[in-house]
């Protein structure tokens, strides 16, 4: 039996981003979030109002995904969208930066982009797909973010292989255990979740949260 001595309702983040959800499906997800007392949600800008209305009497951190999944947001629009998220009640920003600036050697441009996201004062989590970055670029991303005071990192974007235990060890070695590390992508089973937590990961994000919590109930 896996060790489930974790606050799973706080450490498993519900991801609700499917643009094809029916209203009935969206409401059902909200009911499940309340049923399992899930305290952290990642969602798109378009769903912020709906969450605010459906979860009006429920306490949860709602993080808005910006520039996800294509990192195609021009820098000139960052402030407007981040402020929009803040005005709509987002408690944090999960941001996918433009990595090509680093491969061009434009470290200052990359840093300026991250600083622009931070201007709102909301907690910022930087999304990184380790498997798609050259090692030098990957290390540059981490170093710049840490220098700018970023303390929250998400590894995996749902497009690529699942993070391995070797990846986790490498990430922790670079980032350190004092920062918050969330893993996303391919997480469907309770055992995956527990293994990641046992290896030092802070939290996981998944759209399969209902199935995972159903496993917990069986145990």
Where are these regions (language model features)?
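Alpha-helix-loop-beta-strand connector modules within alpha/beta enzyme cores
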Residues: 45, 49-70, 107-132, 162-189
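Glycine-rich phosphate-binding active-site loops on the catalytic face of alpha/beta enzymes
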Residues: 15, 64-69, 88-102, 147-164, ...
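Conserved anion-binding
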Residues: 77-86, 92-154
